[in-house]
């Protein structure tokens, strides 16, 4: 029986993880649930159903509501609060697997606590690798943690790698394993056929209406701008130790092929399934074995048209910014991630237009005095400066 801590249990990844656990109660139990605390009713329901030992939130204003809700339902889960307690839950000797599904840099110290404890970590949070990939991979190597990416694209690549390579993420050279290129696929988002002149008018609701995936609002907007694909590009560099000429990006509308590996003998290994996050999460939970989940099997007769297109980079300026930043150092990717969080939040609040997201991100990259961070503290300092500058630009709108 593997005990699990879920960082971000009320989000999309957290909810899907719990569904898988529900169908595999002979294999997994929930040790602790962690959430910021905005969706208290959801968190209370999760505690009642899964009976974790602990639940912990960051939002102090919701602490009383959480305690009263659990008491009312006679739930014996212990309530904790704050960063220190979350770090302790992430590093507890009782825990076998940590699911890292927080948004942005908010979970950076929790994740590093898990790494230092040598945990098996299922990583859904791309932003942390975007902002501190160098430090992240060094810590993983030092403490011998097991990292399994569970976003669909990196998980697809991971599954297609030789077993020995899987155990050496961030260190192994793809050349030694006969790999020519990694191919990241992307649907192109909900606006792939919208006229460029009309993109300014699109609403947050339209941007969140992804054609293939059900996701949270932030990642849905990132998918619409293809910043998400840009972040995946950056993460692939760190996880799989590849350079510019070893990553290829392709538009694949159907999201059936999640990513591919092109080998030096001309063969291509592709990972295919219906677009459902439970596939990659279940792979991570069961690794190195596979576990059965209540998921639909891919029907090749119903899904018999798979298309591929080159990317129109004029349509996706955020993707361009991410690729450029990835070769300008850790500081640049940290700044881009931070600026993007603020600009996406402003768009969701209808303070700026959809097309302003890329404009603000570029302004912050151009105007901020970016330095190469040499510690987590310096990364957080750079993060703060980028956020403040982005907010300053937004006030001008």
Curated annotation (Swiss-Prot):
Homodimer. The keyword Signal does not apply. This is 1-deoxy-D-xylulose 5-phosphate reductoisomerase. GO terms for molecular function: 1-deoxy-D-xylulose-5-phosphate reductoisomerase activity; manganese ion binding; NADPH binding. It is an enzyme of class 1 (oxidoreductase). The lineage of its organism: Bacteria, Pseudomonadati, Pseudomonadota, Gammaproteobacteria, Enterobacterales. It catalyses: 2-C-methyl-D-erythritol 4-phosphate + NADP(+) = 1-deoxy-D-xylulose 5-phosphate + NADPH + H(+). Catalyzes the NADPH-dependent rearrangement and reduction of 1-deoxy-D-xylulose-5-phosphate (DXP) to 2-C-methyl-D-erythritol 4-phosphate (MEP). Mn(2+) binds at residues 151, 153, 232. Keywords: Isoprene biosynthesis, Manganese, Metal-binding, NADP, Oxidoreductase. Pfam families: DXP_redisom_C, DXP_reductoisom, DXPR_C. NADPH binds at residues 10-13, 39, 125, 127, 216. Its EC number is 1.1.1.267. It comes from the Bacteria. 1-deoxy-D-xylulose 5-phosphate binds at residues 126, 152-153, 187, 210, 223, 228-229, 232. InterPro entries: DXP_reductoisomerase (IPR003821), DXP_reductoisomerase_C (IPR013644), DXP_reductoisomerase_N (IPR013512), DXPR_C (IPR026877), DXPR_C_sf (IPR036169), NAD(P)-bd_dom_sf (IPR036291). The gene is dxr. Its cofactor is Mg(2+); Mn(2+). GO terms for biological process: isopentenyl diphosphate biosynthetic process, methylerythritol 4-phosphate pathway involved in terpenoid biosynthetic process.
């Amino acid at each position: 029986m593997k005990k699990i801590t879920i960082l971000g249990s009320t989000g999309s990844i957290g909810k899907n993880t719990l569904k898988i656990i529900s169908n595999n109660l002979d294999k997994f139990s929930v040790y602790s649930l962690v959430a910021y605390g905005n969706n208290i009713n959801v968190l209370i329901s999760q505690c009642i159903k899964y009976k974790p030992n602990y639940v912990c939130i960051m939002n102090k204003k919701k602490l009383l509501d959480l305690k009263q809700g659990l008491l009312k339902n006679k739930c014996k889960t212990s309530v904790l609060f704050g960063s220190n307690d979350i770090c302790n839950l992430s590093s507890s000797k009782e825990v076998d697997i940590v699911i890292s599904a927080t948004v942005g840099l908010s979970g950076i110290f929790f994740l590093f606590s898990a790494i230092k404890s040598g945990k098996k970590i299922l990583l859904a949070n791309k932003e942390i690798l975007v902002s501190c990939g160098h430090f992240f991979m060094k810590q993983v190597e030092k403490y011998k943690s097991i990292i399994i990416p569970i976003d669909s694209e990196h998980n697809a690549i991971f599954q297609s790698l030789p077993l020995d390579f899987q155990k050496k993420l961030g260190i192994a050279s793809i050349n030694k394993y006969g790999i020519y290129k990694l191919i990241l696929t992307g649907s192109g988002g909900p606006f792939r056929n919208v006229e460029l002149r009309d993109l300014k008018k699109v609403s947050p609701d339209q941007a969140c209406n992804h054609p293939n995936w059900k996701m949270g609002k932030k990642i849905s907007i990132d998918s619409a701008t293809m910043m998400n694909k840009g972040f995946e590009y950056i993460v692939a560099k760190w996880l799989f130790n590849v350079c510019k000429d070893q990553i290829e990006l392709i538009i694949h509308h159907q999201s059936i092929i999640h990513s591919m590996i092109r080998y030096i003998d001309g063969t291509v290994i592709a990972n295919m399934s219906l677009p459902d996050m439970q596939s990659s999460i279940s792979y991570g939970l069961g690794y190195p074995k596979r576990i059965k989940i209540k998921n639909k099997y891919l029907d090749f007769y119903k899904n018999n048209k798979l298309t591929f297109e080159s990317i129109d980079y004029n349509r996706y300026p955020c993707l361009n910014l991410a690729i450029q930043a990835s070769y300008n150092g850790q500081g640049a990717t940290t700044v881009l991630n931070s600026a993007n969080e603020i600009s996406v939040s402003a768009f969701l609040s209808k303070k700026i237009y959809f097309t302003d997201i890329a404009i603000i991100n570029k302004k912050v990259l151009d105007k901020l005095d970016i330095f190469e961070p040499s510690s987590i503290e310096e990364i957080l300092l750079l993060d703060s400066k980028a956020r403040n500058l982005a907010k300053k630009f937004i006030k001008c709108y």
